Amino acid sequence: MVKEFSRSDRVAEQIQRELADLLQFEVKDPRVSSMVTVTEVEVSGDMSHAKVYYTAPQGTPELQKGLEKTAGFLRSQLARRLLLRTVPQLHFVYDASIDRGMRIAKLIDEALPPVADPDQDSEPN
């Protein structure tokens, strides 16, 4: 059975690809590093707003301010690249799921006893 995607889902995927490219190569704001990763984009049903979830090695308030400042530039560049009547307003949201996942993995590693290497168990006689 073919899985169908709504138009807003397809637009969100295209915006995610284009924003990743724009953030890496076009944005010159020093607060916005090229290490920003767009993890997901959610577009409203009327396509007037888009939540852009991102992650970065240093997710700081300065980065958030830099992204908000470049939102107009990014929107204008999206208008040139996408065939849409209106380009959604961009709202940037820090995606903390990767940080939470790393913290949980660390807690699991600390809770489990270390696994002995089977090659080191055999003692020479």
UniProtKB/Swiss-Prot annotation:
Please report the organism this UniProt entry assigns to the protein.
Answer: Methylobacillus flagellatus (strain ATCC 51484 / DSM 6875 / VKM B-1610 / KT)
Ordered alphabetically, the record's keywords are: Cytoplasm, Ribosome biogenesis
- Record-linked PANTHER family: RIBOSOME-BINDING FACTOR A, CHLOROPLASTIC-RELATED
Known partners and oligomeric status: Monomer. Binds 30S ribosomal subunits, but not 50S ribosomal subunits or 70S ribosomes.
Q: Which Pfam families match?
A: RBFA
This protein's GO CC annotations: cytosol
This one is known as: Ribosome-binding factor A
Name the Gene3D superfamilies on file.
3.30.300.20
Broad class of the protein's primary localization? cytoplasm
| The keyword Cytoplasm belongs to this UniProt entry's keyword annotation | yes
Q: What this chain does, per the record?
A: One of several proteins that assist in the late maturation steps of the functional core of the 30S ribosomal subunit. Associates with free 30S ribosomal subunits (but not with 30S subunits that are part of 70S ribosomes or polysomes). Required for efficient processing of 16S rRNA. May interact with the 5'-terminal helix region of 16S rRNA.
**Localisation:** Cytoplasm
Molecular function GO labels: ribosomal small subunit binding
